[in-house]
Amino acid sequence: PGVPDRAFINDIRADLHDTDTVYVALDNHKYGDFSPYLLVSKNRGRSWKKITNGIPDRHLVWRLVQDHVRPELMFAATEFGVFATFDAGKEWHKLSGGMPTISIRDIQIQRRENDLVAASFGRGFFVMDDYTALRDIDPDDFDTGAALFTPRDAYWYFQKRPLGYRPKGSQGDSLYLCLLYTSDAA
């Protein structure tokens, strides 16, 4: 729907949670068209729907990645940064977090730590550490202006000092031993 015939396919992603759903990111910038083209099919490609609401004009979409836990949470790498949707593409929101406004050409999720990794065009890569709080966002809560999230379990680290290991090393606090070895040249 509304995609030029000669648009280039940047990314095709099968839905991680629904075998009938597929996403496609396209661009037509070689013909002077910088519009975002991001489509979804919920019937294995027989029909398509555009899902770019909230992604501004002239923001090419390069890649798309879906959260492996919450199906509605997705991230799009665009010409001017990263966007997130919390409702399966009905509305997109720009993520910044100090990342410069640059072309993000690839985006992946590191599943073990739930990190979002975004690679730019010429500026390096950026990591959003442990984005699991984003899974708790309800799109209806955007009008409130603030939200509290449940933190993940954390470990409290206590340094163990079985032999003291203070200023005098393994000798404890009360004993300091210095040995000097010399060779007899007799």
Task: Name what the model sees in each region.
Residues 181-186:
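Conserved small/polar residues in nucleotide/adenosyl-binding loops
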